[in-house]
């Protein structure tokens, strides 16, 4: 997979709460990249589709436009969107051959029988990157779902994967699973990201008057819910 000067289009699917952060980081680290956010009402998305997706003769020579349209070339380099919009406009996203599909908070794909998984699996892509802090939450079936999404050819049989790694009875089983994951998993640890952070320090504070504390904690919780 090329690491530099790789042209798009790239599709980033993330929760709505992270879209602004993605947009900010792209602007900071790659200001020359044309990044478009696909979100909002149907009318707003139609406008984005009309003016931001493909080249038009009003802004580009006619001959160039015709050539670009034959290639189905996109105006943007990166398209940011949410899970919800991706599901609503899936017919649009499946018409584009994406260079890379990036899925943030990818643990939402842990259920391979869910509609979200089935819909997003139809998106054409040459490469796939899944970002998650919890690739394995409860069951090895969830890990298989992510691996199947990333490489459905190699990880096509859930039963076979679970029968081999489902129990993880001893260190040997864990080592085998690690060897399978190694080509697919890039783990980020604190030491690699920020070397100036001090060592973790835990402080245990004894809380007295627990009944009174519980009353205030419950009141604070319900106030936030409301």
Positions of PLM-derived features:
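ASCE P-loop NTPase motor core, strongest for the SF2 helicase catalytic module
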Residues: 1-170, 178-203, 208-226
